[in-house]
């Protein structure tokens, strides 16, 4: 028999002055990379400083890196980054598309879970960098009575610079709680059948609306230094498997899907081929019509809307390409929401029926 009087929020065997006890709930906290609060210099500087000071992102000694970051990079980069963000900014909501889309994903997933769990499970989202912060959202979930939290980094592929640092922020937030909730972390889902199905469906829908079939589909993944692969990061292998599974699901012949890597910065060797160079090489080789999809991004963001659909598109066309088709991220498409919801339900097993 419960020691809580139904509907009262009070323990039946507790002193009269005992604080009200919240009904136990389960929290699902989605997480993505992050977004600046605005496109102005100081908003961009705060965001970039937090991002580029993360040791999971740039693992150079602070004695070397911080003077360079604070005195050189952050005196210039916020201007160019702000200009790029302004090209894609959601001016109606005064926020980045990533924030808009992640909020929509959260609402859709919560609605999908409602018929199964009722209000026993609440869904929210956080950003690793910028707002809403992971710590603030963990606090809100605990305050709402969540005694268990399922943390879900929305990265299909594991990487130290994405999944691991998101987990770091979550675990750090838990250390601030007097009563820590039970916690679970959702693993990468790069080969989950429903994720592959959602990817394939998005490709098929876009291709069905084209006048001419692209000569090749480029799967462009966020890049990382090559030495991370050598040190044991599984990201590269997982990206290759996603592209292979996508090709097999589509029923296409080997060689019809390429793999490349984008968002390279610094002088260090990164995973190759670089997308911006690869699409130009395709154009010069006679592949005049290409399509590009970004399977590693669960939501459209600066790297897809501005980099792929801007810089990478221009590289292809400048090299003689004729038709460049960008296939949007899965965002809050029904098939994507269904995939994420199923992954959540599997990870809630044992916590709730």
Annotate each language-model stretch with its function.
Residues 2-353:
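Active-site-proximal alpha-helix that buttresses catalytic centers in soluble enzyme cores
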């Amino acid at each position: 028999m419960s020691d809580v009087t139904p509907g009262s929020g009070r323990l039946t065997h507790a002193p009269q002055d005992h604080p009200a006890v919240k009904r136990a709930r389960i929290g699902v906290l989605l997480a993505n990379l992050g977004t600046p609060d605005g496109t102005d210099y100081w908003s961009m500087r705060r965001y970039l400083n937090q991002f580029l000071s993360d040791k999971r992102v740039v693992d150079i000694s602070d004695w070397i890196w911080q003077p360079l970051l604070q005195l050189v990079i952050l005196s210039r980069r916020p201007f160019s980054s702000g200009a790029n963000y302004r090209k894609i900014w959601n001016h109606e909501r005064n926020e980045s598309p990533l924030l808009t889309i992640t909020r929509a994903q959260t609402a859709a997933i919560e609605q999908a879970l409602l018929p199964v769990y009722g209000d026993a499970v609440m869904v929210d989202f956080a950003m690793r960098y910028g707002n809403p912060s992971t710590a603030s959202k963990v606090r809100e979930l605990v305050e709402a009575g969540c005694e268990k939290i399922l943390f879900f980094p929305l990265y299909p592929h594991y990487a130290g610079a994405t999944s691991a640092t998101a987990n770091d922020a979550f675990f750090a937030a838990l250390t601030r709680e007097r009563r820590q909730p039970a916690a679970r972390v959702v693993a990468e889902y790069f080969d989950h059948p429903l994720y592959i199905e959602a990817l394939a469906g998005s490709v098929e829908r876009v291709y069905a609306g084209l006048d001419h079939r692209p000569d090749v589909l480029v799967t462009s993944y966020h890049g990382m230094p090559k030495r991370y692969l050598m040190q044991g990061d599984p990201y590269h292998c997982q990206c290759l498997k996603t592209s292979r599974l996508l090709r097999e699901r589509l029923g296409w012949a080997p060689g019809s899907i390429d793999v490349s890597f984008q968002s390279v910065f610094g002088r260090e060797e990164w995973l190759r081929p670089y997308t911006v160079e690869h699409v130009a090489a395709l154009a010069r080789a006679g592949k005049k019509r290409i399509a590009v999809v970004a399977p590693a991004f669960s939501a459209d963001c600066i790297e897809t809307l501005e980099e792929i659909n801007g810089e990478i598109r221009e590289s292809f066309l400048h090299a003689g390409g004729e038709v460049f088709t960008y296939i949007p991220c899965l965002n809050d498409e029904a098939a994507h929401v269904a995939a994420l919801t199923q992954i959540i339900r599997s990870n809630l097993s044992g916590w709730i029926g």
